[in-house]
């Protein structure tokens, strides 16, 4: 029973549970914090014999507990007596007090967790309830509370991805909800607690409060309090809900959960992603003005500023074709985001008919192109409105990943050789690369400007301090990662004829293209502003035409200093890029003139018989020329131009050891397997071990069959050719099989066209400098017919595609005739490659068919350069 005393009204109010009757068992603390008397009726007797009314305490009263055990029973903030619990009779009634009760009251005012109820079982004090006078902490707003406990901030750096299984996600969610409920109870205690001034100084008890109950007043840290039952229940539920389901990203900047966006990270193109809740990442909440983004393609998470995000509807401005052509992960990301976008917009793309001969990756590529065209057209007919996430996807706890982000066809993208990896490490890559902070490069360059560091000690491409060699073009260092990127991308060109990536870092999305028609280099805005100086990129944009830092008259531009000997350094860079060491090839001494015999040649993937043409030009007698070729047009050209001296044997896969023994022995084996599935320019490439890439192993097989047996010391030579723009891993594998490192030769030194190629072989002097002859046509004008004017001194690499004839960023035709632009004629292309005029003019072939033959052929001056030493070994005319 709770009685009123005549104590002053400013004392603390304390709830008391009356003692049970002798017949009743003592109250036991229940697991949920309720105090229950099993069937017993609690009674209290006043001196006047008045019996109090039965009922519950008023809801606006807040009571303190002095009893330690009862305090533990009330640890969860609930006190729920049974119906037999008596309530105070009348707040105005005064009960007599004795000194013993006064001593009990003083102890209650200083009560802590330590138990005192056993000593004062039958001496309960009744204090006047003053709940209406109490002040609720946090009632004016939690921001003004003295007990603010800001959440610890955990910064997040993009790194290893989080692949969340359903089981693990459920475990995390359950754990976070338990933590939120626990925190909610603490907040409820702190929000509803009543401040009660102390009546007189009291002696503090040596006890500590329970972990779940926070001190309410700095002056009295040991007073353990609990909220009034009904209020605590309501606050518990509300606070738990607010802590667990508090809305995210409510900063008025848009881009809520579930929206499809483009995000920009330094060193990467704009990448598609999806805004997700913080709990999905397993990290802390994103700060105001930032969003958690889950990237398509690799499933990683990053915190990105709102300023670095664009809606997916900005597809035409954010989509980067060069990155799409090069990086398989980017293609996969585009495929996935457009799958989700088409699903939301209700756009259905017709399925491509599949049969046994249709490659799944080609089907995916066709569908992807259809979706990209739809996206570039503005996501019609629904437009950007149709890309908004449905209501269920805005729920942060909705499991949309397994249902919405399925990628059955995306897996058909066979992972080709690793492309440029701009300063970021992923677990999918075979090597773990160094993660460089966004500001590392800027900080190091600043130190160079302050003369605190040597620029040769840092990688000017990415900012790494793990320098392994010098940059071949500019003063500065280069790390191993950027070296591999440079090897892959230095000779990769877009459809406009310019390099696909920055000359310095082999990255960047926004690049400046040189205005010199004979230069094809690009520089990204980031490198220009960082190394040349702030604002240099804008100044270059305003300058028209702008000559880049490789062809400009000056050699120094801020910290960007061009090496004077860069041509030879670039040559040595590709000549000495070998991470594998092999024994030098066997050197054969020259054969005396009287002992020289005609050469016997096995040409695999022969094309239009460039090898035989060069041997004839050099005057070397050819005894036998066996060629493996499957293209009918190429066979026709070879048969007509060489009067049937070539023996065609069909598909290389059908040539056996028996055939080699029958046709041999051979003195020279040459070939260049198709590069379609090796070149990183091809977005659908399959690599060395699939598609046409596997044909390299046919060359390797027949090369070993044709080698001289042990004891046969006759000179034996071989040559294998392929593109420079191949993956580092593919080049490494080819070198490992051939037990030789390649040399890189660019035909621009001896012809009017760029054409960089790798050559493996044991021909003498393959590493010697490439020198032009008097008969080589080094300028495009020398290759043109009368009355035609060349607009460029050299053309870019001519391929099998018709648009490879166009030059420059504006796609100009290379020739000017009759005051009009014109393409190269077939006879002019033949001169560019070094072939005789009308060499491919057989069988009424069209212009495009002739260009396809030339686009797959070798450059005649380059092969002449490689074959020239053979005159010391074989008979000549």
Swiss-Prot record:
**Zn finger (GATA-type) location:** 458-488
Q: Which stretches make up the SAM-dependent MTase C5-type domain?
A: 599-877
Q: Where in the cell is it found?
A: Nucleus; Chromosome; Cytoplasm
Give the catalytic activity: a 2'-deoxycytidine in DNA + S-adenosyl-L-methionine = a 5-methyl-2'-deoxycytidine in DNA + S-adenosyl-L-homocysteine + H(+); L-cysteinyl-[protein] + S-adenosyl-L-methionine = S-methyl-L-cysteinyl-[protein] + S-adenosyl-L-homocysteine + H(+)
Q: Which residues catalyse the reaction? A: 675
List the SMART domains hit by this protein, alphabetically.
PWWP
* A GO BP entry: response to heat
Residue span(s) of domain ADD: 447-579
Give its E.C. classification number: 2.1.1.37, 2.1.1.-
Which principal EC class is assigned to this enzyme? Answer: transferase
**UniProt-listed InterPro entries:** ADD, ADD_DNMT3A, C5_DNA_meth_AS, C5_MeTfrase, DNM3A_N, DNMT3_ADD_GATA1-like, DNMT3_ADD_PHD, PWWP_dom
Cellular component terms per the entry's GO annotation: cytoplasm; euchromatin; nuclear matrix; nucleus
Please state every residue range assigned to the domain named PWWP: 226-284
**Amino acid composition bias (Basic and acidic residues), ranges on this chain:** 107-133, 195-206, 234-244
Kindly state which keywords UniProt assigns to this record, in alphabetical order: Chromatin regulator, Chromosome, Cytoplasm, DNA-binding, Metal-binding, Methyltransferase, Nucleus, Repressor, S-adenosyl-L-methionine, Transcription, Transcription regulation, Transferase, Zinc, Zinc-finger
What does the record's free text say on domains? Answer: The PWWP domain is essential for targeting to pericentric heterochromatin.
Q: Which family does it belong to?
A: Belongs to the class I-like SAM-binding methyltransferase superfamily. C5-methyltransferase family.
Function noted in UniProt: Required for genome-wide de novo methylation and is essential for development. DNA methylation is coordinated with methylation of histones. It modifies DNA in a non-processive manner and also methylates non-CpG sites. Acts as a transcriptional corepressor for ZNF238. Can actively repress transcription through the recruitment of HDAC activity. Also has weak auto-methylation activity on some Cys residue in absence of DNA.
Its name, as the record gives it, is: DNA (cytosine-5)-methyltransferase 3A
Organism classification = Eukaryota, Metazoa, Chordata, Craniata, Vertebrata
Report which gene this protein is encoded by. Answer: DNMT3A
């Amino acid at each position: 029973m709770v009685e009123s005393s005549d104590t002053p009204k400013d004392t603390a109010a304390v709830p008391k549970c009356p003692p049970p009757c002798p017949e009743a068992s003592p109250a036991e603390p229940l697991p949920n914090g309720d105090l229950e008397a099993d069937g017993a009726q609690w009674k209290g007797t006043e001196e006047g014999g008045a019996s109090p009314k039965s009922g519950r305490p008023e809801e606006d009263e807040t009571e303190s507990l002095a009893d330690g055990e009862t305090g533990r029973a009330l640890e969860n903030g609930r006190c729920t007596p049974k119906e037999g619990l008596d309530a105070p009779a009348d707040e105005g009634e005064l009960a007599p007090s004795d000194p013993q009760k006064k001593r009990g009251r003083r102890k209650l005012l200083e009560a802590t967790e330590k138990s005192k109820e056993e000593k004062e079982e039958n001496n309960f004090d009744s204090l006047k309830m003053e709940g209406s006078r109490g002040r609720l902490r946090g009632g004016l707003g939690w921001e003004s509370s003295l007990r603010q406990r800001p959440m610890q901030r955990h910064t997040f750096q993009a790194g290893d991805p989080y692949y969340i299984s359903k089981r693990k996600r459920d475990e995390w969610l359950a754990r976070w909800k338990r933590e939120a409920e626990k925190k909610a109870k603490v907040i409820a205690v702190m929000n509803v607690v009543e401040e009660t001034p102390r009546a007189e100084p009291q002696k503090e008890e040596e006890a500590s409060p329970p972990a779940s109950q926070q001190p309410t007043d700095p002056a009295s840290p040991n007073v353990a309090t609990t909220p009034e039952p009904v209020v605590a229940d309501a606050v518990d539920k509300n606070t738990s809900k607010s802590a667990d389901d508090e809305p995210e990203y409510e900063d008025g900047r848009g881009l809520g959960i579930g929206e499809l966006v483009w995000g920009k990270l330094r060193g990467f193109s704009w990448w598609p992603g999806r805004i997700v809740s913080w709990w999905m990442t397993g990290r802390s909440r994103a700060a105001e003005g930032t969003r958690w983004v889950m990237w398509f393609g690799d499933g990683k998470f990053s915190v990105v500023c709102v300023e670095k995000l664009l809606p997916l509807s900005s597809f035409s401005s954010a989509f980067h074709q060069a990155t799409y052509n090069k990086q398989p992960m980017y293609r996969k990301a585009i495929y996935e985001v457009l799958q989700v976008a088409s699903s939301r917009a209700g756009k259905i793309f017709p399925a491509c008919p599949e049969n046994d001969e249709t490659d799944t990756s080609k089907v995916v590529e066709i569908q992807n192109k259809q979706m990209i065209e739809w996206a570039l057209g503005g996501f019609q007919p629904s437009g950007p409105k149709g890309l908004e996430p449905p209501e269920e996807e805005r729920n942060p706890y909705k499991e949309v990943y397994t249902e919405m982000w399925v990628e059955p066809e995306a897996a058909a993208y066979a992972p080709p050789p690793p492309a440029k990896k701009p300063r970021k490490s992923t677990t999918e890559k075979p090597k773990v690369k160094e993660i460089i902070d966004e500001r590392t490069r800027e900080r190091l360059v600043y130190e160079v400007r302050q003369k605190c560091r040597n620029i040769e000690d840092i990688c000017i491409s990415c900012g790494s301090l793990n320098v392994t060699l010098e940059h071949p073009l500019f003063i500065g260092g280069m790390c191993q990662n950027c070296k591999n990127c440079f090897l892959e991308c230095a000779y990769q060109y877009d459809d406009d004829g310019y390099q696909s990536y920055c000359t310095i870092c082999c990255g960047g999305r926004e690049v400046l293209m040189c205005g010199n028609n004979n230069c094809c280099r690009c520089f990204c805005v980031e490198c220009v502003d960082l190394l040349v100086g702030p604002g240099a990129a804008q100044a270059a944009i305003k300058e028209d035409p702008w000559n880049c830092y490789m062809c400009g008259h000056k050699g120094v531009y801020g910290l960007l200093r061009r090496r004077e000997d860069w041509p030879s350094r670039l040559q040595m860079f590709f000549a000495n890029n070998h991470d594998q060491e092999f024994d030098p090839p066997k050197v054969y001494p020259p054969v005396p003139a009287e002992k020289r015999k005609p050469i016997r040649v096995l040409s695999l993937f022969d094309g239009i018989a460039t090898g035989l043409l060069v041997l004839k030009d050099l005057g070397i007698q050819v005894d036998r020329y066996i060629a493996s070729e499957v293209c009918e047009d190429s066979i026709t050209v070879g048969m007509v131009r060489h009067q049937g001296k070539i023996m065609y044997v069909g598909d290389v896969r059908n040539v056996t050891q028996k055939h080699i023994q029958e046709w041999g022995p051979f003195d020279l084996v040459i070939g260049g397997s198709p590069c379609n599935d090796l070149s990183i320019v091809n977005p659908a490439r399959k690599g060395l071990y699939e598609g046409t890439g596997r044909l390299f192993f046919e060359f390797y097989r027949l090369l070993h069959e044709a080698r001289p047996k042990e004891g046969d010391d006759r000179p034996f030579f071989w040559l294998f050719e392929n593109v420079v723009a191949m993956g580092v891993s593919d080049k490494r594998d080819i070198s490992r099989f051939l037990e030789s490192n390649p040399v890189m030769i660019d035909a621009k030194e001896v012809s009017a066209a760029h054409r960089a190629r790798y050559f493996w072989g044991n021909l003498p002097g393959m590493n010697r400098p490439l020198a032009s002859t008097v008969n080589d046509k080094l300028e495009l004008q020398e290759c043109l017919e009368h009355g035609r004017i060349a607009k460029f001194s050299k053309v870019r690499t001519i391929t099998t595609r018709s648009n490879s004839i166009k030059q420059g960023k504006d796609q100009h035709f290379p020739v000017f005739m009759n005051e009009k632009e014109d393409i190269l004629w077939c006879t002019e292309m033949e001169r560019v490659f070094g072939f005789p005029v009308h060499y491919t003019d057989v069988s009424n072939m069209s212009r495009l068919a002739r260009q396809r033959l030339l686009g797959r052929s070798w450059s005649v001056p380059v092969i002449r350069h490689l074959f020239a030493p053979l005159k010391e070994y074989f008979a000549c005319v």
